[in-house]
């Protein structure tokens, strides 16, 4: 209590005349209530087939009061954190959305399934390559399909961006109208709501969004960005977008509560990767891959606590499957971080490859304190003139100041003309990853440890960092000239039961029964076992292996 009173007095003296004062004081109140979750108590017992809700924002680092950044008040997320568990050590495997989302939905590292380049379905023409999709091993499914097989109603509202087209078996509903409200009564659900207001593009001018915070609010300016009017305006836009996102999340949470589902639902909040600013997005520094995550369990289990374990996005799929009562498939490269089957993670891994028309091959491994980075294109600097990023005013400002020679040593680092082959950072004492320790004698044991871990990981997931993208496409397409296509499914009837088969290994089969009472947009069901339909009903069938073209659809009319 004495510490809190002292902190309030300091803040009061410094900020009493600032409009930001009430926001900062309330933020401190929200962020001071966390305790560490007791070690060994990650086995959370909840009813099987609980509802699961994901609230996913874009391009946002840990810029929240509940994660120590008191710049802007986020009452809805602060409430969620106070009623749930805060996870401060969660990492995306890439500093951009599409590879990261591929990892989330498959439980596989992007560079192990051909999802590592940003993007596979666009910008390839800049490099003279065809559009393609990631092609995981045949046993790999979207984990939402596995939930559907267990009776879950699965919806995605509305961003996909998986580096492949989602099979019809992936979701019951997928689009701007997708919602748990559309399920059958009593059916458990897994629902995702995506919020793009915090996306990098939200920094572009003209900025015409609602104003949620004062423009003269105080900011933490990271040392790699200059303190200029332009940078401050972009920071204001970033935090204003976060405040707007919090309002949007509040509306979804209110719907959940109004429907009487809050205490029957596990609620996740996280960002799809780190921050939107230059030297954040697209990089494997913590600023690009470290994200906030909050999980609220029914009845506020472990409310207001913090879990410090290392978590990777590849761990999301096995964790949700475990929470739903399923045993996660062996092919998953991640591991459950909650439940009886959880395994302690010692390292997280990340990668960088092509971004739009530019390629920079980098791999990273991090433990709870140190990060090792391996640069494969040392003759190339870190900064890439990505056209999309050049639209951010701060990026234009950095380029202008670099030309004038006005950037200091730290701010100039990103514009180095060459890179060291290896980098080692103490992320605890150097959170912005400025000081490379790779050549310092006292850190050689740690360097060797993380170097060996990277080699182990690259071998385990069959990552080939030096593989040209053209050769990757040939590998995914098995040296054919065009994207492979799923073979047309075949229907057979035995004693009135319909059996559906597909000759493409790993293809998922979706079907829907169409009669005069059925909606023309009814979701495809996941085919698992033979079934019967009434005479005269129509059956529509599609087969689809991830990364392939979907099969030609077929229609069958029951005559039995």
Language-model region placement:
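Bacterial Sec-dependent N-terminal signal peptides
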Residues: 1-47
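Hydrophobic, well-ordered secondary-structure elements that form the walls
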Residues: 320, 424-426, 430, 450, ...
